Amino acid sequence: MESAKYTILVVDDEELMRYLVVSYLSKLGHSCLTAIDGVDALDKIKRNKIDAVITDIRLPKMDGITLISEISRQYPGLPVMVMTAFDEEYSERTAISVGAQEFLKKPFTLDEFAARLNKMINDAEVLKRMKSEKPADENLQELMNELEKTLKNS
């Protein structure tokens, strides 16, 4: 049996949405964990090796923006995608500014979801590899910093 591609944490207080996302990700070969709020999500991240997080904005106990901020602070480099029906430009700007790499508004197509998730995870892996390799000189370090800013803002 082939091992899962990635372990993805799906955070949403709506059971149906969690079920649909997990079912789709499982068909793509990913392993999934779920959480119903930000507090539960941080606990799952602490206890498991998570490759990516997909979260809603509106969550009980700890909202998605606070969750993203905490992930960025405690687990830098862990990619986060927001998927929400909460349609305000403020939410997208805020989520990206606190550390989300992708912002997907519901409803969305499965193809769009998969493409953006794969891009986000691949970008995070490239950045991680680049950071783990010792830069040959300061120019390369500056280039890496610029690439990180570009990836964060794309």
Regions found by a protein language model. Give the residues of each.
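Two-component/phosphorelay signaling modules centered on CheY-like receiver
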Residues: E15-L33
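Acidic catalytic/metal-coordinating carboxylates
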Residues: D37-D40, D63-T66
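Active-site T/S-Asp motif of two-component receiver
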Residues: T55-D56
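Receiver (REC) domain active-site loop signature in two-component systems and cognate sites
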Residues: L59
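Alpha4 helix (beta4-alpha4-beta5 surface) of REC/receiver domains from two-component response regulators
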Residues: T66, D87-E102, A115
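A Lys-centered signature of the CheY-like receiver
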Residues: K106
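CheY-like receiver
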Residues: N122-S154
